[in-house]
């Protein structure tokens, strides 16, 4: 199941894909694809050329919008992490007795970190102690160069109220 994004609704697919911060690895895919939102031809050409060089045989790569103007080193590091994740899945599959869950998509808070946290992020506020631990572990394993202050908001006001984020929801659900 793929979550709805922007104008795209939820989709169900049998294609395996492993999303990274900048790249999506498709272990049984083919080719190098670039996000349509990257619209400068020079950047598309740069990413396509890099993708051809670094793509493992028999796989497909999709460069996400976030890969625009990102250094080759960070893109390669992202791909290496995805390849390692795929190898771990394959190893677990070899030793597991079906039925068994061998991989799970990241929870919502980790998707937010993956997609929105960058080198300019200095603070993340979370209202769940367990989610803070998962977030710290995620950053240690995936974004080791980021230094972020995690603030636990669980004992304070509701996080959406504190940052005045409820108004758009209230007007949407209470028309008139």
Where are these regions (language model features)?
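DE-rich acidic low-complexity regions and acidic surface loops
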Residues: 1-176
């Amino acid at each position: 199941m793929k979550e709805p994004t922007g104008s795209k609704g939820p989709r169900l697919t049998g294609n395996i894909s492993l999303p990274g911060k900048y790249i999506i690895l498709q272990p049984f895919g083919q080719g190098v694809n670039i996000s349509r939102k990257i619209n400068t031809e020079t950047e598309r050409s740069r990413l396509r050329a890099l993708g051809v060089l670094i793509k493992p045989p028999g796989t497909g790569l999709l460069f996400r919008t976030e890969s625009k103007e990102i250094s080759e080193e960070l893109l390669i590091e992202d791909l290496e992490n995805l390849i390692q994740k795929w190898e771990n899945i394959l190893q677990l599959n070899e030793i597991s007795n079906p039925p068994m869950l061998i991989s799970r998509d990241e929870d919502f808070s980790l998707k937010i970190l993956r997609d929105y946290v960058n080198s300019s992020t200095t603070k993340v506020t979370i209202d769940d102690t367990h989610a803070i631990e998962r977030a710290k572990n995620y950053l240690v394993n995936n974004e080791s160069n980021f230094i972020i202050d995690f603030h636990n908001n669980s004992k304070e006001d509701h996080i959406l109220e504190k940052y005045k984020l409820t108004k758009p929801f209230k007007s949407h659900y209470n028309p008139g």
